[in-house]
Amino acid sequence: MAITAQMVKELREKTGAGMMDCKKALTETNGDMEKAIDFLREKGIAKAAKKADRIAAEGLTFIETNGNDGLILELNSETDFVAKNEGFQTLIKELAAHLLAKKPANVEEAMAQTMENGKKVEEHINEAIAKIGEKLTLRRFEIVSKTDADAFGAYLHMGGRIGVLTVLEGSTDEAAAKDVAMHIAAVNPKYIDRDAVTAEEVEHERQVLTQQALNEGKPEKIVAKMVEGRLGKFFEEICLLDQAFVKNPDMKVRQFVESKGATLKGFVRYAVGEGIEKREDNFAEEVMNQVKGSN
C-alpha cells in the first residue's frame, strides 16, 4: 500500500523516531501502524544493545516523596546535554513514581517489574534510548521511610547533579531538614556521627597521625595528646554532626538539629557519576567512531 505523509507523521508522533526511519518501518510492514511501532522498537532496542559498552557517566539525581515514603534515584546518560532533554526528564519522573509505588528491593528487581503502562521497566527505558539516541542507565535508588512526627529534607544541587535526602526525627520542620540536606550536598560527610565510624578506620587514622607527629620530630611524651587533638579534626571532616553548619558556621550541625528538638535519623547523598570511570574519547576518535558506525 502507498505510504502517506500523514502516516509517517503519525508514526513519528507515536515513537519520536526520525522521518526516514518511520517511512522505512511503514514500508517494511506494509503500512501496519502497530507492526511499524514494533519494527522501530526492535530497531531501537538493537541500537541500545550496540551502545551497551559505552559509559553513561552523566545524568541526574531525582527525589520523590509521598507521605511517609521517600525515594532518591540516579539515572545516567552519556552526555550532559541529554540529561537536559525533555524525554529524559519525563523518564526520570516516571521511574521515580513507579519505584516509590512498587518499592523493589534493588535495580535488578525494578527492571523486571511492570509499569502502569503495561511495559517492563527495562522495556520502557529501552524505548527512551531509541528515542533519545543515548545509553540510559538506572544506576541506583534508595527508598526511605519516616513517621508522621518526622520530616524529609529534599535538596537537588545544580538541577540534580547532586541529590540529598534526609530524615529529621522528632520534628516536622521540612525547612530545617532541607537545610541539613544542603549542608550535606556542600560538605559531603561520610557518616552521621563518630559512633558510625568503624574502630578499624579510627585506629588506622590514629596510626597515620602518630607516625606523622613522630616524623615532625615531636617528643614521644606529647605525641599521644597531639594525635587525639588531630583525631578530633578528622572526625569533623567526615562526621556530619561534628561539622560547622554551612548556613551558620558558629554552630555545629548537631546544635542546629537539637535546636529544632530533633535528631538526624539518616541521609542519602548521590553525586552523578561518582565511582564511574568516565572514558574520555578525543574529538577525532569520536568522529571516526561515528563514521565507522554509519557504515
UniProtKB/Swiss-Prot annotation:
GO function terms (MF aspect): translation elongation factor activity
UniProt xrefs under Pfam families: EF_TS
GO cellular component: cytoplasm
Cell compartment(s), UniProt: Cytoplasm
Highest rank taxon of the organism: Bacteria
NCBIfam families: tsf
Protein purpose: Associates with the EF-Tu.GDP complex and induces the exchange of GDP to GTP. It remains bound to the aminoacyl-tRNA.EF-Tu.GTP complex up to the GTP hydrolysis stage on the ribosome.
UniProt protein name: Elongation factor Ts
Gene name tied to this protein: tsf
